[in-house]
Amino acid sequence: MEPKTKKQRSLYIPYAGPVLLEFPLLNKGSAFSMEERRNFNLLGLLPEVVETIEEQAERAWIQYQGFKTEIDKHIYLRNIQDTNETLFYRLVNNHLDEMMPVIYTPTVGAACERFSEIYRRSRGVFISYQNRHNMDDILQNVPNHNIKVIVVTDGERILGLGDQGIGGMGIPIGKLSLYTACGGISPAYTLPVVLDVGTNNQQLLNDPLYMGWRNPRITDDEYYEFVDEFIQAVKQRWPDVLLQFEDFAQKNAMPLLNRYRNEICSFNDDIQGTAAVTVGTLIAASRAAGGQLSEKKIVFLGAGSAGCGIAEMIIAQTQREGLSEETARQKVFMVDRFGLLTDKMPNLLPFQTKLVQKRENLSDWDTDSDVLSLLDVVRNVKPDILIGVSGQTGLFTEEIIREMHKHCPRPIVMPLSNPTSRVEATPQDIIAWTEGNALVATGSPFNPVVWKDKIYPIAQCNNAFIFPGIGLGVIASGASRITDEMLMSASETLAQYSPLVLNGEGLVLPELKDIQKVSRAIAFAVGKMAQQQGVAVKTSAEALQQAIDDNFWQAEYRDYRRTSI
């Protein structure tokens, strides 16, 4: 459902003069009307011409095109964001296909690596371990009283780049930009946070420009006590906030999610968001290839928290489609660097134990090795779906893909590792090795593949198709928790918007130009499920839709009226 055009009410603000021009959430730059310039002491502080936001956006677009590298484009866009947020979002929404990879993956990875070098202006909250006893004061310093979404990281596992210390702040900033651009959540309601618990990245510790706490990372009880202090301070300041954990190391990600998901409205996008968008993609791809997801055999390369989170949601979805839990688990095979996860493998992590295969059931496999490699698994399982979350490039070899294709005429191959340099195989190779028959979705953006004079569009299995809609649905419904069923309703809704399913051709996921429409549909499904699950107050469908409309922010200037503080 398309958003209804809302008549914007005037905004009463107490700021004037240079202070107003330095306030990114309120600054209009050259779009201040003459009346506003008189009323807010801006006469002579701006050029004579009063511009529209579209005229400003056109100038910004011309300037943007003058930058030759992606990181320079990223820096330029961040500068606009820190100067005039409304213009930033108008520009991004006008050119979302071009700019999403610049404000988020893959370019944000380079921005995190160079965070201290390219730092210009503070955004968000930096909480160092040294300041742990000032947590309440730090959050009180945030000028926005009505924060509704926080994205927090500790910078330890940034994309596939590892420990970036305080540089990890680039991820919450970028993620929240997508909450607004794709999900219509007002930037005034968002807050990026980095927990600065030190870094084990020696290059950063030796860098004279590094702006974080120069100390090895705290661990164990010290770490968890620090995070708990943060959670309690957030609950005290904004008890109804949605808290998203982002890019925490595997050893901490699942424990933190399990510890706090029933204490504060929270989720982990790397685990749950990735799982939800992947399952939505698989539902659509399975329908396009013929049949249901429950009919497919699935092999994973990568058995960390993200891979196992996806696997568990797939199992839940196939149970919804009619499988028993035992049968659903027998169809999912997890491979890590030590081979196929089996019940005989030592040192399994807690979240891996339910995803093992019984070694006794593999006695008839065609292999001479005790360690069951990815090729062994593909040869014996004959999977319909191959998913890569290994973070290692090139592991989907030609031999493996061709072996898969021998037994599956329409293989679904999803190399999801980020950034592009870490992808398990390129779409170009996968299409060629399967004679143009594979359905491919990737974690990073790729251009369409041309093979034998045919164009193959490549869908990006981008969490931005999921988390903005979840956030909007939580805000609109007032949900106090995010349940697994809410996430699965988001996946099913995403699948319903697949052009490949709807039209028999095109991308397996919607085009970015439709992402706000998809986010609004996901918000409705998530809000409705929250009501059904008892974590949100029940309302009529019309009331829920109205709440979504009311909370959907658009990048338009409002008229200002002067008031005193």
From Swiss-Prot:
The active site is at Y104, K175. Transmembrane segments: none annotated. It catalyses: (S)-malate + NAD(+) = pyruvate + CO2 + NADH; oxaloacetate + H(+) = pyruvate + CO2. It is an enzyme of class 1 (oxidoreductase). The keyword Oxidoreductase applies. GO terms for biological process: malate metabolic process. One of its GO terms (cellular component) is cytosol. Its EC number is 1.1.1.38. The record marks D270 as: Important for activity. Keywords: Metal-binding, NAD, Oxidoreductase. CDD domains: NAD_bind_1_malic_enz (cd05312). The keyword Metal-binding applies. NAD(+) binds at R157, D270, N418. GO terms for molecular function: malate dehydrogenase (decarboxylating) (NAD+) activity; metal ion binding; NAD binding; oxaloacetate decarboxylase activity. Divalent metal cations. Prefers magnesium or manganese. NCBIfam families: PRK13529.1 (NF010052). Belongs to the malic enzymes family. Homotetramer. This is NAD-dependent malic enzyme. It comes from Escherichia coli (strain SMS-3-5 / SECEC).
